[in-house]
A protein has these predicted regions:
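The canonical Cys-X-X-Cys-His
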Residues: 65-78, 129, 157, 167-179, ...
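N-terminal, post-signal-peptide region of Sec/Tat-exported proteins
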Residues: 44-76
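Post-cleavage N-terminal segment of exported redox proteins
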Residues: 2-52, 79, 90-155, 181, ...
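An amphipathic alpha-helical core segment
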Residues: 173-181, 186-200, 207
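Acidic helix-start/capping segments at beta-turn-to-alpha-helix junctions
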Residues: 69-82, 86-89, 147-148
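Extended intrinsically disordered, low-complexity coil regions enriched in Ser, Thr, Gly, Ala
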Residues: 67-71, 79-81, 185-188, 254-255
Length: 256
């Protein structure tokens, strides 16, 4: 698809008018929900994403082959974890010499210290653990430090966010910086903020992490997704998370 057609598709968004963006205030995807869906997200009993959080809590307390569980170090239900530190992810690991997402840190810690069966990044149980741990920082402001050693990865993620993808030939920022609140191919667009992830998606009927959501977007643009946990997705997560700085964590958010 050529660029004239892809531009026409974007301008077909309901009421589309190009306007300058980033520099605008960060707005959570929560703001684009109906009042009924906001109420559902806010109610722990009604929020379907809480099932994934509860599954993660069970895994957190399950001992591995050496008899240790995540709770052995981090307290019952993660009581010893610092919500402010959770809100700083992704962070740069001096030991690994690369950025580490929250899910990657959980898997690294679990695989090294509990002697449980190793989990892959794309494993459903890895997503459940991430949802549980991030839920512990509910209401904490996202606070990713994109300076210092993360700066190069922030810039790499920004370049990817501004790269045109696939046969549809559209970049992430074209939808999420310019057309938030409008629809594209029947999909309500938001700013693409990360503060609600992992989120429950009504269109999928399941909880997805940020990288899973990026893969869905690339597939919709007829582009080849990267593997979950890849350098490209990690750089994108660094950029998108820093872009959400100041927004309160809502995990598990509800999104369309």
């Amino acid at each position: 698809m050529n660029r004239h057609i892809s531009r026409a598709l974007l301008l077909a968004c309901s009421g589309c008018a190009m306007m300058p963006a980033w520099g605008q205030d960060a707005v959570s995807g929560y703001a684009y929900l109906t009042p009924e869906m906001q109420e559902m997200q806010d109610d722990d009993f009604a929020n379907p994403g809480m099932l994934t959080v509860e599954a993660g809590a069970a895994l957190f307390s399950t001992p591995g082959a050496n008899g240790k569980s995540c709770e052995s170090c981090h307290g019952a239900l993660g009581s010893a974890l610092d919500p402010k530190q959770i809100a700083r992810y992704p962070v740069y690991s001096d030991r690994l010499q690369k950025p580490v997402t929250l899910r990657a840190r959980i898997l690294q810690c679990r695989n090294e210290r509990t002697a449980g069966p190793p989990l892959a990044y794309a494993d459903e149980q890895a997503l459940q653990l991430e949802a549980f741990v991030r839920r512990l920082a509910l209401g904490e402001a996202v606070n990713v430090d994109a300076d210092g050693p993360l700066a190069a990865h922030y810039e790499a993620g920004k370049r990817l966010f501004h790269t045109r993808w696939g046969q549809v030939d559209i970049a992430c920022h074209q939808c999420h910086d310019y057309h938030a609140g409008k629809t594209f191919r029947g999909q309500l667009l938001t700013q693409g903020q990360s503060n609600g992830f992992p989120v429950y998606r009504f269109t999928k009927g399941q909880v997805v992490g940020l990288q899973e959501r990026i893969s869905e977007c690339l597939t919709n643009l007829r582009a080849e997704p990267y593997p979950l946990g890849s350098k490209q997705y990690t750089d994108l997560e660094v950029y998108m998370s820093a872009r959400s700085n100041g927004l309160k964590i809502e995990t598990p958010g509800i999104r369309y």
